[in-house]
Amino acid sequence: MKLLKPTWVNHNGKPIFSVDIHPDGTKFATGGQGQDSGKVVIWNMSPVLQEDDEKDENIPKMLCQMDNHLACVNCVRWSNSGMYLASGGDDKLIMVWKRATYIGPSTVFGSSGKLANVEQWRCVSILRSHSGDVMDVAWSPHDAWLASCSVDNTVVIWNAVKFPEILATLRGHSGLVKGLTWDPVGKYIASQADDRSLKVWRTLDWQLETSITKPFDECGGTTHVLRLSWSPDGHYLVSAHAMNNSGPTAQIIEREGWKTNMDFVGHRKAVTVVKFNPKIFKKKQKNGSSTKPSCPYCCCAVGSKDRSLSVWLTCLKRPLVVIHELFDKSIMDISWTLNGLGILVCSMDGSVAFLDFSQDELGDPLSEEEKSRIHQSTYGKSLAIMTEAQLSTAVIENPEMLKYQRRQQQQQLDQKNATTRETSSASSVTGVVNGESLEDIRKNLLKKQVETRTADGRRRITPLCIAQLDTGDFSTAFFNSIPLSSSLAGTMLSSPSGQQLLPLDSSTPSFGASKPCTEPVAATSARPTGESVSKDSMNATSTPAASSPSVLTTPSKIEPMKAFDSRFTERSKATPGAPSLTSVIPTAVERLKEQNLVKELRSRELESSSDSDEKVHLAKPSSLSKRKLELEVETVEKKKKGRPRKDSRLLPMSLSVQSPAALSTEKEAMCLSAPALALKLPIPGPQRAFTLQVSSDPSMYIEVENEVTTVGGIRLSRLKCNREGKEWETVLSSRVLTAAGSCDVVCVACEKRMLSVFSTCGRRLLPPILLPSPISTLHCTGPYVMALTAAATLSVWDVHRQVVVVKEESLHSILSGSDMTVSQILLTQHGIPVMNLSDGKAYCFNPSLSTWNLVSDKQDSLAQCADFRNSLPSQDAMLCSGPLAIIQGRTSNSGRQAARLFSVPHVVQQETTLAYLENQVAAALTLQSSHEYRHWLLLYARYLVNEGFEYRLREICKDLLGPVHCSTGSQWESTVVGLRKRELLKELLPVIGQNLRFQRLFTECQEQLDILRDK
């Protein structure tokens, strides 16, 4: 054995409370007290192991120093993969660190340039839950969980896959919890506290397995820490600071029955730390000796307040070695090297010691295969870690389930290979740019600073920012919901490169996440992801959502009509006996202002309507003044016969102003009985002529000419329709105020509240419909005709079936605010009217329930906090367009989401995500949008699978499956919005098959579908 105390490992005379060696053995970390804060230092292991490296000045001894903790650091622990370092301190925080590959060293802050950080480590997550000092942290096998204990008497289990999610808070101790340890087979976690107890908790349900108190009855809270340890074979748990006949011991607790019949004795003061060697040993065979197999044994190091260290072998009754007065103060922590032959010990006196053993002294270490066989023979399975998405001990009972699991593993392997290629490509690019190294570029930048001289001759130098270039593997955020799959754990164990598959600090879309199964999501407005863009996107004239490429395309086009601006609605109080405002005759100056306003609005409309190839047509009829009197302005000349010009065919019909002839009809409407606060919508006035292009059929044009003089002197209005060169025309006795068309019908609204409907060949389908009040907006989609009147009543008819869909429904219930206006109108292909209001809310009318339903809200906090990027199957699946996507108009709310998710607890985020996805499914169902319903249902089910919500998932499967056997009394419907429910269930099965936890549900649904198929 060799003993070394490297004096250069220190915290400037301050105490060192913790030490831990990196799994690859190249570095080690110390944690303790700094000058004015807690200090975490990462040291090079090579100068400790090799004397030549210690003397070589070119080999750095200190790699990095982090002073982020506000108070003393009590514990530092490397993850088993070596990718992360966790530190806990008196500031009640746990910080998780990850290396950042910077170019070149940097100096330690406050060291006046004397200390340099060779490696750069950044804090990727700060875990806040404890209300007192954090005394110990411990990573579980395979890094699935991180446990922390505190003087607040609790143990917190963190989900290391999705920081900062808390899986459980273990409450049961009545004193300061000062030590933690996981058993090597992942079934228990043990904690020791000042309440004179050691408690063992089950990881299956995070409940108490046993509480051991007898060996600690005589103990007092005299130690700073109580670091207990579990043997690598899982047979023994050794505690710190127990008492036997008033003498300090380290109590040995047998896993079988939790018996306390043995202990390590000999120390004169309380035991502070116990640490088992990670290796299992067997006796070294000497030359010529018998080949009889030896019994495996373990090695354990014990540190005490008496400043001595003892090393024990479980095959010996006495310690292998005892070193007295190794330090000036109490021993605080112990760490073994991964090969099991070296040990680092730290003390409160601020120094560390390294002991180097030989195989002749300890024995031959067993291989990992032999160690795994010992676990299997004793416990059946090794490392039986159970998380939400990984059940290593579960047996796959269904061949279809096995097929899905293998497919998922192959996809993860492909993603890993692609990521490896991208990383190698990026490293080659960042290392050399155009044949010049980054270091040379950095030096040349100093020579290229910009220098100018002012008029008075003084020099002005523009400084250049020469920042460190980070080439590390950085993710965008720390929130994600990627479950740790069974194949993922195996990959992490098999190769170091698999470490990148553990997304500790990766985010998570609603919506591109750095996870194995999700590609970066493109920003396209055709994607109904619940994300949001700027407020102007909702009111844009063009709608990119309709023209974006999509895998889940809708067979029919939606025709939203952006019909109202901020001056849409007017509220007036009816004053009995007072003269009507409509009787006021405007002056010539006012008439001129009206004409100028018309010209200005027309020019704006022409500029905003330049794209004639949109799938979604938005028409914006504007009320030209807040005055109720609107005069006719002769601004549109009589159109020539034949095909209209391009600029005229795009001219919105809604730019007309009201004529004096229409005042009588408006006055008639205002004379109707109304409440004290009446809602009045603008009325379009007749034009001499106008042309309208039908948005659903670009080859279809509607031309209207009012007051056409005939031979008898009778004035008529002419309606023309041109479709693919085929033209028809008809005449009407009243002047046409507005017109609309679709691929199925053409309708016009005339004076005297008349609405006429024609087929696309010019045949009148219905006698003129008398509207309850003058028309305000007219719109057609397919066979559906929607009329919105000046009295704010809405009607929708199916003219082919000649039935009413919505009958004179009032908008008063949704326009409740004094300044509320309608900013956009939609009529879906199923005749569902949708109103977008100025406050960002959108309501659709449900004909079945005769209610207005809220389907979108731009200020919805659920959409801002929802995070379901882990549930996105692919980039293409997000390109789902439809009425819901057009209404919501969201493509990316990552900015608002990122700002909120850092302050939103994961439990709240999980609940808001569920609520948001359920709202999306319900909204798509109400809008009868089959493609969007399928999209959001699959997304919702995938999130339930990832988060482990079995009850809700089972309810969905039950509804989609329906009764297996025929029943006359069953009310179950086999379709939903035109989709067969059992076909949807078949699409859900591969999603359910990704989580072994739901294999029973998968098998049940699969078997019942097979029974139905055989029938």
UniProtKB/Swiss-Prot annotation:
Spans of biased composition, class Basic and acidic residues? 603-617
Location of the region described as Interaction with histone H2B in the Swiss-Prot/TrEMBL record: 594-824
Q: Which residues carry this modification: Phosphoserine?
A: 111, 548, 556, 583, 608-610, 612, 659, 673
GO CC annotations, alphabetized: chromatin; nucleoplasm; PML body; protein-containing complex
Modifications the protein undergoes after translation, according to the UniProt entry: Sumoylated.
Q: Where is the composition biased (Polar residues)?
A: 413-431
- Chain residue ranges for the region called Interaction with histone H4: 736-1015
Q: Which CDD domains match?
A: WD40
Per UniProt, the ranges with Low complexity bias are 494-507, 540-556
Q: List residues, modification Phosphothreonine.
A: 554, 575
Record note on quaternary structure: Interacts with CCNA1, HIRIP3 and NFU1/HIRIP5. Part of a complex which includes ASF1A, CABIN1, histone H3.3, histone H4 and UBN1. Interacts with histone H2B, histone H3-3B, PAX3 and PAX7.
- Any idea what this protein is called? Protein HIRA
Give the species this sequence originates from.
Answer: Mus musculus (Mouse)
